[in-house]
Amino acid sequence: MHGTGRAWFLFLANIIFINYILYYMKSMIKIAKSILPLLGLLLSLSLSAQDIAVKGHVKDHTGEPLIGANILIKGTSVGTISDVDGNFTLKAAVNDILSITCIGFKGQELTVTGSNTPLVITLQEDTEMLDEVVVIGYGQVKKGDVTGSLLTVKPDELNKGKQLTAEDALVGKVAGVNIVPGSGAPGSGGTIRIRMGASLSADNDPLIVIDGVPVSNASISSINPNDIASFTVLKDASVTAIYGSRASNGVIIITTKKGNTDGVSRPSFSYSANVTVGNVYKKLDVLSASEYREAFAKYANAPESFKLGNADTDWQDEIYRVAMGTDHNLSMTGALKNMPYRVSVGYTNQNGTLKNNNYQRLNASVGLSPKFFDKHLSVDINIKGSIENDKPVSTGIIGSAVGFDPTRPVYQDYEGNVGLGYYMWMDAGGPITLASSNPVSDLELADRQNKTKRSIGNIALDYKIHGFEDLRLNLNLGYDFLTEDNHDNMPELAPAMYTGNEQDGTGKRYMYHNDKRNTLLDFYANYVKDFKEHNINAMAGYGWQRFWYKNHDTTTDTKGENLTSPKHAEAELYLLSFYGRLNYSWKQRYMLTATLRADASSRFSPDTRWGYFPSVAAAWRVNDEAFLADNKVVSDLKLRLSYGQTGQQSIGSYYQHLSTYTASYDESRYLFGNKWHTTYRPNGYDPNIKWETTETYNIGIDYGFLNNRISGTIDYYWRNTRDLLNDIFVPAGSNFTNRIETNIGDMESKGLEIGVNLIPVRTKDWEWTFSGNFTWNTSKITKLNTIDNESNYVKTGNAGGTGRYLQVHMVGETPNTYYLLKQAYDENGQPLDGKYIAKDGSITSSEEDANKYVTGKSSKAPYYYGLSTRLSYKNWDLGINGHGSFGFYVYNYVSASNSFDALYGSNGVSSNILRSTLENKFTQDRQFTDHFLEKGNFFRIDNITVGHTFNKLWNDRTSLRLSFAVQNVCTLSGYSGLDPELYDGIDKNIYQRPRTFMLGVNLNF
């Protein structure tokens, strides 16, 4: 079946399934409508005489009235709320049970007796809110005892839109966390940065810990979002230092869903499904065929013999399509005696908006939590597996489609079946090898597939010692195994086989295999003891982790003959750790935390191998003081102060401190006599390379007002990173290569983070919640090398190709600051082609670095924010999520790479141009001018979701929810390109994220 036909078949099949459910519901509703009037009449006759007006007053333990307390007749939807004086009136029957609840207080139930005496109900403060535990490194801590900057996010099942990857659930949700979503390719992971990252070219990804297993900082797209119970984001050093050498960029702890722990043994099932339709809603503005012919005649420098074609082809329309997708998840949760369990499976099939792009994922997970020896031994077993089948496409196809001549056809036949029926550039000598290939042929002829198998699991033992139950011994054994098998094949005679390095039409088969093994062992003891008003929670442990990989790749022709030498690589890394933490609190009012971790990494030499990472933090629960005891406005107020050090050991090479050698490939061997000899090339190295060390100061406030109807956090931090790791050029002859990874400088960062949660409305039928966060971050490089001046900088921000660097790291500037030529303009504001303002103010045509200037503008966003709101009425709900950034800049490299020269190039082919080129009238590509540097400010409405829930369909356990959502609704921005939300700030060949419409079903039974 054709791909489009198959997609529509899947879509129709899902629609039929959903319609079946709706038909079943409709039948049930008809039956209910027939029966309910009769039941209502009987009930009214039997109960009307017993209905009485129940009056009451709700107050707290100090006698103050509670506003907005919910009073509900148990088992019904009949209820009311208390007024500003704490009073309420409700009609109820004798023996009805009233359920009284209020945020921040323990609920209470009362039976209606028929007495005329008004009820006086006193609700006690809910201390369990303080006793709620949050997950931290190597353990848990009471929420009220937290001294560091962390936030736990639980996925909102009613307001999440379409979440294909795990990081989608965090976008715009946490202050200080900036997530740039991946490209429009399905399954592409986003870039996560906590507090902008603490390094330059070393790894800036946060450490990801899944159920106690620190995983490699690769994409977490293999994790099923439906299996995730919570994310805990650790931001300051007091909570991240326990992870030592990998925590400079923050930590994200992912906890997956577990089995029932409430004693319910009967299994419960949950099924969710959705169908999606997506499309690109914005294309690059290029010339149509008729407009192109006019521009070509006016501006192209082509010989008279060169003729345009007769076609009218919109090449962007030819490569894009409507993308269909579906997602199914089924889970079973229950308990067998003392063993809670959860089993789940999930399947995702998502087409990309580029033709032939498809992503499929199969997930399965098993979680067991048995207890033995009178619950003294707790065992937690988690196994997660996934198989990903990705059919990727080259994003260069987008640029090729934008620039391909619109007067040329998509298909054309040539002698000898050259081109396999697709149009290609030809001259009298045959195919033009310097021309770009037909983008449609690349999409339809290429056979690309990336298959990834991954399993993450662990077994954690928690033994509470008999007779000394305050002491627990913990053992955690975990693994993260991954296998990749990729291939990229192109048949003989394909147009792509006549361009670039492939010039004779020979087919190509590229194969890549990669194995990764990450194993760990953690053993630690935990001592928890309450001494009247004093509480101690102490932990000490040992950790061992091994990282190993082995890969090889080959490139052959279609007959299996090697076109290049096979390449092999294998390496391993060890991490050895000792760590400890002490939490102390007095009256749950004054808290102190101290941690220390020592890490040894085999990445470094024995002289610099060990790193020591301490931290200390204190907190004060101000609202528990006597002077706030009678305050009815402040319900929570805690001050936090912390200091700590963390490290960075994630550099490019496993053996950067050693002198290593690489065997030459076949094409680089030497002939001595009659025999070819393999040579060995030395690699660059730095024997003195050492840890990057980051120290952070943090001051924070946790607040809550009006029974926590208003709550949130405020944090301010200052951070300094010493011995920055960066890849730099070195003087010729000083090392075996011209670039090495080494310690070159320091960087200072600071920021303000504000989070707020509001419940403006909460009544019997209505509830409106709102959450928002705002972040201000700034980073400045304070030391870069032994000599720091304007001429000493590190180039970065490569736009592609040799020497096309658009950004620099420089002392006194934000990382990734643009370093460009200052464009000259005429008196009408029109840019002068090839004219720039030199540093002395004169006009120059030279594009040398000496004429470039530090713009003071960076791709790093100093300000970003997120907004989320949900409105519910009875069983209806409406949710909206959005996020945005401002203060950063984007270089429109797509526009900078367009000029009149492209109309007819030196390679003898014609190319299309952007409409903006007619405005600036540049005759050549001007890829280093600040004319194309634009503000990237934007606000994106991520999703709008509306749903309806049907409770108690055929029993109390059964519910059904239908929802409709729009993902990537719109982006408000003044940027002229497709999308300003780019991690590196350089807009080139982007695969834009589609606008997606989703119909979803959730069934619980």
Kindly label every feature range from the protein language model:
Residues 2, 8-386, 394, 426, ...:
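Short, small/polar-rich motifs associated with maturation and membrane association
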Residues 63, 86, 416, 429-430, ...:
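Detector for glycine-centered tight turns/loop "hinges" at secondary-structure junctions
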Residues 71, 100, 208, 584, ...:
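Short aromatic-centered micro-motifs
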Residues 153, 167-173, 739-748, 790-818, ...:
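C-terminal extracellular loops and terminal segments
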Residues 158, 204-205, 323-326, 360-362, ...:
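Extracellular/periplasmic, surface-exposed regions of secreted and cell-surface proteins
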Residues 270-310, 655-656, 742, 761-859, ...:
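Conserved small-residue
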Residues 316, 440, 601, 883-967:
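Extracytoplasmic gating/loop element in the C-terminal half of outer-membrane beta-barrel translocons
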Residues 858-891:
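Glycine-rich, aromatic-lined ligand/substrate-binding cores of catalytic
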